[in-house]
């Protein structure tokens, strides 16, 4: 069964190109290490909710957009191996993220349906 790392972040609108550069560099490594796919999505239409929403979940500021991303793996074992490589990687450690990592939300998911 496929595994997915999911992420939601608030990125300053002005940092779109810097974000894309860091995302490309990270994606290259994740794919080399065994990930099946890396997807990065830049906010187009993220409405405010009545109770909660993406913007509140990451305490997005007025000048920030929501980025919704995921990394797919063929199975849990591959995901765990990739995570180990990520933690040990000097390249990942040296990457500067163009957003506040403290407000990043993430989780690991088992694919339930993929049609």
Regions found by a protein language model. Name each.
Residues 1-18, 25:
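Long, hydrophobic N-terminal alpha-helical segment
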Residues 18-31, 66-70:
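Generic detector of contiguous secondary-structure segments
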């Amino acid at each position: 069964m496929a595994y997915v790392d999911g992420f939601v972040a608030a990125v300053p609108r002005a940092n779109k190109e810097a974000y894309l550069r860091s995302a490309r560099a990270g994606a290259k490594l994740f794919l080399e290490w065994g990930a099946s796919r890396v997807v990065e999505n830049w906010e187009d239409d993220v409405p405010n909710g009545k109770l909660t929403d993406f913007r509140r979940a990451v305490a997005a500021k007025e000048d920030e957009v929501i980025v919704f991303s995921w990394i797919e793996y063929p199975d849990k074992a591959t995901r765990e191996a990739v995570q180990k490589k990520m933690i040990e990687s000097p390249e990942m450690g040296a990457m500067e993220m163009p957003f506040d990592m403290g407000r990043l939300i993430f989780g690991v998911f088992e694919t339930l349906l993929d049609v």
